Amino acid sequence: MRKIEPSLVSIVIEAAPRKTPLYDEHTRLGAKMVPFAGWLMPVQYTSIVEEHQSVRNNVGVFDISHMGQFIVDGAGAQAWLNGMLTNNVDKLNAGMGQYTFLLNDRGGIIDDLIVYRIEEQKYLLVVNAGRADEDFAWLQNHLSDGISLTSRSADFGAVAIQGPRTNELFHALFGKDVELPARNHIADVPFDATNVSVARTGYTGEDGIEVFFYAKDAAKFLTAVLERGKPLGIKPCGLGARDTLRLEMCYPLNGSDLSPERNPIEAGLGFFVDLAKPDFVGRDALVKTKESGPREKLVPFRMKAKGPPPRPHKQSGNQQDHPAAPA
């Protein structure tokens, strides 16, 4: 069979980074834009250190519109998702979310994600930007009859508002009588003649929310966030601070700490795997790992003093240490 090479046109299309609904706002705010996971994203506005400290001490806002957003709908959606994801979807009531994994047949991590139950048989999956296309294809290939899987990524934007003053900014945006969702919960909240979805989640180690809205409302919402957050010391924050914040908390990064060659038990994240479930993709491989012990273990460490980046180190016998994401 003749090998079909991709055309020049397809290569150009694939290589061109996409822009989030907030791209013009980023350039207006003076952000330094870089390609990331197929998107043009702000890496910083002022300095990574300033943005990092703003989130730790006050509040910051990040564009997370590049992340994939999928809707799973239909009778049997709960049972189907429980067979595709490692955590127990049965534990979710409407309005609740949980961290979980999408695995291949060998138990390797395709992606880590958050699944929200937004109605009785309707779910929102928020996945990593760099894995979104692969995730969608994998789920599509395993789809059961009666289940609808759609991507709303092109029609929606999202921001993460993170920091100890998130609660104050939430009420400044939505009203003092509107209740902030509980941790790992999601709710629709009125905003300027429309509704936005507010989830009490984040990737920084601080209190925070992630807000999902129609792409057409993106600029208006970010403007409101920055204006009403000004008395609270808010700063727009880029990917640089997002990375240092998650690294400081030892949160894993897909593509570095997590990969299809490493399973959740080896990644030290077995807490988000429910082996009591009778079946899910990758379960058999995880049971074997549990019984025999992991071939490797991802563990956090902190440098005691300044020094060169850690390198692979053979400690004893066949054991060898490999730093996954040095700071």
What are these regions (language model features)?
Residues 2-103, 108-110, 240:
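Acidic, proline/glycine-enriched N-terminal capping motif
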Residues 2-37, 42-43, 118-327:
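Conserved, structured C-terminal
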Residues 88-142:
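Well-ordered mid-protein domain cores that form the structural environment of catalytic cofactors
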Residues 86-87, 111, 247, 262:
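N-terminal, helix-rich and Lys/Arg-enriched segments in bacterial and organellar proteins
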